[in-house]
């Protein structure tokens, strides 16, 4: 569905529904940098794919790679806007409200998963299911929700959504990584949506979403340097250690023959080949 599911990487949805005003500068935190002199957008590697505005609206053209999600009633007023999509609750979706011909986000919790809803989702190739939970043990409930979708043969992509409030940045990172990472690492989910109220800067929340995808190896957005398990060197040390290791190798090659290991016998080579 558009860029969800299949062989696509999981998508990141940023929550801007709680902001009173949204300007070009507001998108800096989610990876979109607007250049006033050049009148163009510069996009970082950790730029979110969609922006959830809820009942809010923006009065400027968004970058070409960014989709905007409105609550259904507000979307009806902006449906002619390019790359704008509705956010529809499950009970309204089943009743057959007006939909976008390109992409529709359907909000559902475990109690909303019924045969009627799954049939409606499978019958519309433009739908993406955005799941949420109010359960204290939300991770287990959302895993159960995925089991229900699998048992009912639901074919639409699923975005894992979680809401947090009044947490420190460290707590948010730990909770979100546990709640979402455990699902993504089992290939459950085609995107993430973190709604964090009073939990830290928007940039930190956005980076947390991308770091979760990076840690689960479902979407690589930055280069990682892994040290050698033997000596502890990493790539950035290679330029300083290579001359040393090269000279050591040359010294070993100049040792007398009695210090060298004798070549393996043909029988050993045949056994290990």
Question: Which stretches of residues belong to each language-model region?
Answer:
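Catalytic alpha/beta core domains of metabolic enzymes, predominantly
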Residues: 1-4, 13, 111-273
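Active-site beta->alpha loop and helix N-cap motifs at the rims of alpha/beta catalytic domains
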Residues: 2-4, 11-140
């Amino acid at each position: 569905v558009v860029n969800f599911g299949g062989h696509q990487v999981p998508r990141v949805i940023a929550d801007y529904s709680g902001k009173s005003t949204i300007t070009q500068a507001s998108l800096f935190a989610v990876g979109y940098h607007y250049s006033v002199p050049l009148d163009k957008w510069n996009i970082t590697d950790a730029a979110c794919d969609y922006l959830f505005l809820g009942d809010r609206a923006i009065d400027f053209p968004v970058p070409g790679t960014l989709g905007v999600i409105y609550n259904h009633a507000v979307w009806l007023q902006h449906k002619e806007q390019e790359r704008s999509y509705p956010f529809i609750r499950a009970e309204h979706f089943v009743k057959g409200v007006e939909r976008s011909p390109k992409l529709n986000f359907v909000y559902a919790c475990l109690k909303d998963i019924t045969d009627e809803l799954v049939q409606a989702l499978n019958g519309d190739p433009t739908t993406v299911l955005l799941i949420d939970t109010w359960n204290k043990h939300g991770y287990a409930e959302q895993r159960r929700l995925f089991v229900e979708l699998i048992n009912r043969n639901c074919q639409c992509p699923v975005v894992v959504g979680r809401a947090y409030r009044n947490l420190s940045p460290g707590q948010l990172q730990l909770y979100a990584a546990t709640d979402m990472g455990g699902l993504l690492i089992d290939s459950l989910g085609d995107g993430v949506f973190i709604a964090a109220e009073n939990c830290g800067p928007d940039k930190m929340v956005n980076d947390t979403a991308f770091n979760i995808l990076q840690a689960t190896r479902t979407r690589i957005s930055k280069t990682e340097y892994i040290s050698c398990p033997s000596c502890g060197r990493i790539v950035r040390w290679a330029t300083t250690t290579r001359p040393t290791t090269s000279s050591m190798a040359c010294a070993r090659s100049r040792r007398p023959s009695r210090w060298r290991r004798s070549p393996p016998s043909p029988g050993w080579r045949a056994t290990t080949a």
